[in-house]
């Protein structure tokens, strides 16, 4: 088996790979391990009064377990964790208070991480942020004792008679009922008081005469914020936006447009990764007898997790704050569910109260209860369309405007709701060219578990709504649904709903062109007629299509990468990337092959401390003259389909430095020069008329000359992307070259394991034309286009939908690894299938009652997939072209999210084609199908 697939061999052989596999002995940590259980509130709409200590002791005795040590909110204060307690009043607005139990004013050391929420532990006398928020940390000596108590605690009887937690029933508030009305589609959506809103996003773009307006230059405009307390300059802009929105609405009737009004609901779902959140922590001392908080856990966001724990260690009352070391493990699935999770914070909190190591390991019940979820969403859309020429029925149709109001359930703790709402709003109009748009999105605070950056980041919710509506409009005007789409697609140089130009390559039109020629599409009517002619119409057949342009990355993306070559030619890659089943380890290993002639034999992921070393360290600060170590961002969380476009680019840039300034000079010594057409074949550098040079020989020569001649045997690079790749000139070995990186350190021989051997290379500058001046206002700039053709059968008696055929059409660019790509396609389809037909986390309080597990949460199985599998159609980039308008010649796109975004609307459109029923509430359960089939 090739070395870069070794991780998969370890998994199938049952070796220790994931965080759950390891114990403290594996890490060499001394002392008895305590097992952590988080005791959680069962209500968030009334004051929590405290634990019933007598009842708790009675339960421990009943179960025959040794009573654990119990840490509560007051214990945090006693250990100087004096973070502010902020409570929700009856309106739901958070407000900062000093809790009476503290008896002290807040001081400068009070810190609550932005992504953590309002409480660490709910204090007596306070309202919890959400059902399931911890009120106490229990430290058990035996893991079996913990499991006994956890099993007892989730039984319904715990709520009856003598519950463990005491609440003040007279303090019940009703603010959350409005939220339940929002997320319950059967009761309908409605507007809410601003006090219940985490944040809002607006995209108003009007071309109405005398009321022109665009979000370009007015990123934070709010057409509803017109009060006297608003800054006058902002109020003036907001007033313009408000007038523009009203002008758009008036123009619909004035121009005689046809209006389609629809409300769509997409449910909350669980990421359902197989490897549950697990970790170990130990507050101990290092070799220099300094305190260190060691954490070993799986995470998608190692830097953010470490920074979060550092907010705790900064409160350490006894001398110098402990240093934080974070060791990461492959996580066996993330899907956004481990992105800015609070797990590491609670793990560290427990370690502060124990003189030995601690272990926190969620079971499936706990993961369902408190893990990050996909946002439930309501989209109220008003789509206006009409003939280009009202006098000519054959003139074709124009999309006049989209007026959309979006509500997303953010749960009780603010995770990444604001950017998710923003991206959902940005994609509300899909890949289509509307003349005007008035889009508003709101993140809502509820009693439920926190919602975050689950796969798709708000775009699947938007795609379900707009693709269903476009399909319905095409049907209403008697047009082929794909042909109708093709006429109205955004292309490169168009503007998005925020008014910004789409500068880079966009291939949605080619996706639709390919789909229109597919046999599954061209034969759909004949197949539907065939089904209609048999079985008295009991089973109906239909084919649906949906497409999307899926944003890649975040609004700004930064990564570190290191490539080093040993004296024997072995290649090592280190990266801030995280392996979570998407194949990053393999992808980065083979990324070195084009430049170094072989794949890396060793890949180290989740690297943090090494890239923060003094010899390499960059400063997180805006670019500025005379500040060659400044960079606006250090690195990303592992999300947003970043491997292909961002991490591989960084590895390639590091490998290029090693080749240009390490191996190439050695080849020139042998050949006299290195021609442009030199290339690698079977591990040897070859060129016409020149003897092949083995990689091992070049590596040995580079190491031998490294110290004396300054040849590079290793390189660490940092890249930064914000609408364009930052670039600068670097001088090495007397040669100056422009590179699409903003940080560089090189190794001149020696042991690459010792990061102290690296030397920082000062960049010349970061040209402002390399990072567009308006980039900070440009929400997204690179997109992967995708589409699905899906055939279904609908049993009109049972309401059961079966997917019988499927084609994924994908704009992935150059394929880096075919099997990994195919795995993403199949996995994305399965996830989309689950969201469409099966999965559902009910709104609070039912969805957070602590008893949700796979017996109550159906997921798709292999038998639910199309019998012949998911067919894949790839859209290659023509030779000589690239994704970016300017900059590095990147030809690969991240597609992990694009492959699932359009599954939901494609199935819904297939059901409509089969039955005529347009369904706007997910999941499409048999009961909802039968309801939709009623006359």
Q: How would you name each of these model-derived features?
A:
Residues 1-202, 206:
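Flexible, low-hydrophobicity surface segments
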Residues 5, 65-66, 73-76, 99-112, ...:
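C-terminal catalytic domains of large/alpha subunits in multi-subunit enzymes
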Residues 81-86, 149-152, 276, 306-308, ...:
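Short acidic, glycine/serine/threonine-rich loops at helix termini
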Residues 141, 355-410, 543, 646-678:
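Phosphate/diphosphate-binding loops
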Residues 181-313, 489-568, 771-773, 788, ...:
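Helix-loop-helix junctions that connect adjacent transmembrane helices in secondary transporters/permeases
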Residues 307, 332-355, 359-363, 369, ...:
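Thiamine diphosphate
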Residues 380-402, 563, 789-808:
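Active-site and channel-lining beta-strand-loop segments
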């Amino acid at each position: 088996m090739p070395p870069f697939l070794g991780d998969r061999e370890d998994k199938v052989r049952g070796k220790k790979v994931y965080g759950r596999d390891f114990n403290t002995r594996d890490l060499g940590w001394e002392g008895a391990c305590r097992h952590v259980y988080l005791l959680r509130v069962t209500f968030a709409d009334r004051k929590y009064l405290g634990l019933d200590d007598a009842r708790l002791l009675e339960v421990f005795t009943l179960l025959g377990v040794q009573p654990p040590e119990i840490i509560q909110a007051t214990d945090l204060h006693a250990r100087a964790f004096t973070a502010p307690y902020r409570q929700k009043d009856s309106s739901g607005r958070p407000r900062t208070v000093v809790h009476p139990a503290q008896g002290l004013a807040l001081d400068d050391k009070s810190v609550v991480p932005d992504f953590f929420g309002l409480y660490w532990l709910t204090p007596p006398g306070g309202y919890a942020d959400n059902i399931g928020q911890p009120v106490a940390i229990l430290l058990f000596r035996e893991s079996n004792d913990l499991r006994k108590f956890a099993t007892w605690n989730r039984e319904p009887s715990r709520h009856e008679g003598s519950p463990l937690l005491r609440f003040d029933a007279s303090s019940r508030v009703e603010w959350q009922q409005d939220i339940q009305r929002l997320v319950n589609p059967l009761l309908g959506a409605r507007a809410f008081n601003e006090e219940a809103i985490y944040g809002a996003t607006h995209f108003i773009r009007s071309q109405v005469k005398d009321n022109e307006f665009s979000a370009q230059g007015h990123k934070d405009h709010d057409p509803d914020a017109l009060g006297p307390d608003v800054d006058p300059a902002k109020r003036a802009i907001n007033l313009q936006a408000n007038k523009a929105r009203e002008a758009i609405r008036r123009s619909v009737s004035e121009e005689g447009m046809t209006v389609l009004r629809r409300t769509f609901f997409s449910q909350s779902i669980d990421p359902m990764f197989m490897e549950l959140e697990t970790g170990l922590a130990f507050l101990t001392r290092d070799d220099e007898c300094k305190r260190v908080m060691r954490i070993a856990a799986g995470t998608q966001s190692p830097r953010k997790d470490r920074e979060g724990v550092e907010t705790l260690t900064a409160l350490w009352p006894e001398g110098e704050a402990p240093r934080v070391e974070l060791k990461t493990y492959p996580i066996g699935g993330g899907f956004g569910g481990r992105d800015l999770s609070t797990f590491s914070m609670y793990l560290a909190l427990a370690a502060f109260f124990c003189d030995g190591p601690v272990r926190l390991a969620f079971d499936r019940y706990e993961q369902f209860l408190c893990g990050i979820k996909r946002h439930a969403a309501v989209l109220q859309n008003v789509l206006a369309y009409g003939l280009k020429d009202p006098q000519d029925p054959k003139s074709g149709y124009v999309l006049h405007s989209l007026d959309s109001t979006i509500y997303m359930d953010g749960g009780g703790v603010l995770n990444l709701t604001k950017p998710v709402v923003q991206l959902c709003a940005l994609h509300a109009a899909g890949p289509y060219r509307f003349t005007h748009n008035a889009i508003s999105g709101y993140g809502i605070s509820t009693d439920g578990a926190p919602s975050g950056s689950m796969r798709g980041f708000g775009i699947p919710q938007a795609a379900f709504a707009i693709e269903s509506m476009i399909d319905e409009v095409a049907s209403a005007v008697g047009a082929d649904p794909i042909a109708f789409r093709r006429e109205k697609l955004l292309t490169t140089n168009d503007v998005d709903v925020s008014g910004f130009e789409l500068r880079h390559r966009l291939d949605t039109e080619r996706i639709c062109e390919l789909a229109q020629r597919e046999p599954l599409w061209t034969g759909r009517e004949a197949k539907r007629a065939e089904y209609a002619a048999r079985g008295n119409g009991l089973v109906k057949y239909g084919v649906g299509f949906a497409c999307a342009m899926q944003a890649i990355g975040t609004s700004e993306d930064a990564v570190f990468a290191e490539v080093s070559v040993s004296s024997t030619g072995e290649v090592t890659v280190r990266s801030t990337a995280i392996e979570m089943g998407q194949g990053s380890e393999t992808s980065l290993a083979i990324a070195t092959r084009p430049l170094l002639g072989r794949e890396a034999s060793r890949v180290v992921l989740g690297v943090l401390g090494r890239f923060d070393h003094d010899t390499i360290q960059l400063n997180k600060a805006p670019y500025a003259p005379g500040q060659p170590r400044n960079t606006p961002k250090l690195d990303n969380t592992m999300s947003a389909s970043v491997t292909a476009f961002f991490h591989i680019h960084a590895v390639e840039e590091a490998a290029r430095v090693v080749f240009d300034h390490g191996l190439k000079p050695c080849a020139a010594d042998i050949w006299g020069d290195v021609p442009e057409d030199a290339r690698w074949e079977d591990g040897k550098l070859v060129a016409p008329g020149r003897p092949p040079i083995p990689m091992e020989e070049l590596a040995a020569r580079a190491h031998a000359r490294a110290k004396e001649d300054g040849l590079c045997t290793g390189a660490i690079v940092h890249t930064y992307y914000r609408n364009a790749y930052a670039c600068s000139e670097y001088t090495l070995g007397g040669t100056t070259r422009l590179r699409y990186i903003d940080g560089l350190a090189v190794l001149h021989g020696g042991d690459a394991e010792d990061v102290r051997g690296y030397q920082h290379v000062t960049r010349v500058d970061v040209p402002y034309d390399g990072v567009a001046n308006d980039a900070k206002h440009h929400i997204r700039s690179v997109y992967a286009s995708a589409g699905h053709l899906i055939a279904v059968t609908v049993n009109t008696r049972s309401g059961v939908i079966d997917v019988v055929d499927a084609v994924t059409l994908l704009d992935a660019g150059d394929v880096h690894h075919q099997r990994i790509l195919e795995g993403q396609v199949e996995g994305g389809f399965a996830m989309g299938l689950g969201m469409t037909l099966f999965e559902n986390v009910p709104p609070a309080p039912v969805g957070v009652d602590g008893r949700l597990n796979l017996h109550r949460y159906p997921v798709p199985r292999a038998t639910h997939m199309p019998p012949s599998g998911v067919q894949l159609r790839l859209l290659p980039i023509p030779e000589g072209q690239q994704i970016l308008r300017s900059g590095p010649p990147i030809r690969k796109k991240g597609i992990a999210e694009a492959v699932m975004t359009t599954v939901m609307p494609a199935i819904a459109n297939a059901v409509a084609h089969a039955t005529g029923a347009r369904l706007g509430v997910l999941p499409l359960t048999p009961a909802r199908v039968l309801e939709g089939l009623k006359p």
